[in-house]
Design a protein with these regions (language model features):
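Active-site acidic/histidine proton-transfer and metal-coordination neighborhood
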Residues: 1-99
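Short, surface-exposed, charge-dense and proline/glycine-enriched linear segments
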Residues: 28-37, 65-74, 106-115, 162-173
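A general structural signal for well-ordered alpha-helical packing
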Residues: 63, 89, 105, 117-120
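Conserved mid-sequence domains
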Residues: 97-107
């Protein structure tokens, strides 16, 4: 599950943090009602969404506020690399002990000196810090007809990387024509 970007656990504003905790607790409750596992097999994925200040202080504030959330959230919450700001895979891995959802388009928009393969591997390893969990990664491509590289394409032109390593990963396909895009990826010949 991927709650909206207005959720900012690292906010300096207490009202925003309280709204975020309430929203995340609702997602955790709903996942419990659906019978979802209370671990990283059923992640709740959010962005840090705060680039103002020292990364260590931001991460500490994020984690302190995460501990105010219900167990249904704490046991599932993961963070995602961002397409703007500061939160790249390397910085997330340095400051967070929870898994990182790798988003290939975000990495292209906000590279951190790591190749796509290196960023993929780094994020993959974070899912195994507390046991074995199959990572949930995001796949998308830039829209070819838009000037903003962050705009998501309608359909894929390639298939998500697996690094050639046969790493088991679940992908959330973040392309505009979701079902058609998934079918196109499933029928693509693999090299």
């Amino acid at each position: 599950c991927h709650p909206d970007q207005f959720n900012v656990l690292a906010s300096l504003g207490q009202a925003q943090v309280e709204k975020t905790i309430k929203e995340l607790n609702h997602h955790g409750w709903l996942m419990d009602m659906l019978g979802a596992h209370r671990d990283y097999r059923c992640p709740i994925n959010i962005h840090v969404n705060n680039a103002k200040g020292d990364p260590a202080e931001i991460a500490d504030r994020f984690m302190m506020n995460l501990y105010k959330c219900d167990e249904s959230v704490r046991s599932r919450l993961v963070v995602e690399n961002e397409d703007k700001g500061i939160w790249t895979p390397s910085l997330l891995a340095k400051h967070f002990t929870i898994p990182i959802t790798y988003d290939n388009l975000h990495h292209k928009c906000l590279p951190d000196g790591l190749t796509e393969d290196q960023a993929y591997r780094l994020c993959y390893r974070t899912w195994h810090r507390k046991g074995y969990f199959k990572p949930l990664f995001h796949y998308s491509e830039s829209h070819p007809d838009k000037s903003n590289p962050r705009s998501h394409a309608d359909m894929p032109t390639e298939i998500p990387i697996d690094g050639g390593y046969s790493f088991p990963v679940d992908y959330d396909i973040e392309l505009k024509w979701k079902d058609d895009a998934i079918r196109a990826i499933e029928t693509c010949p693999k090299n």
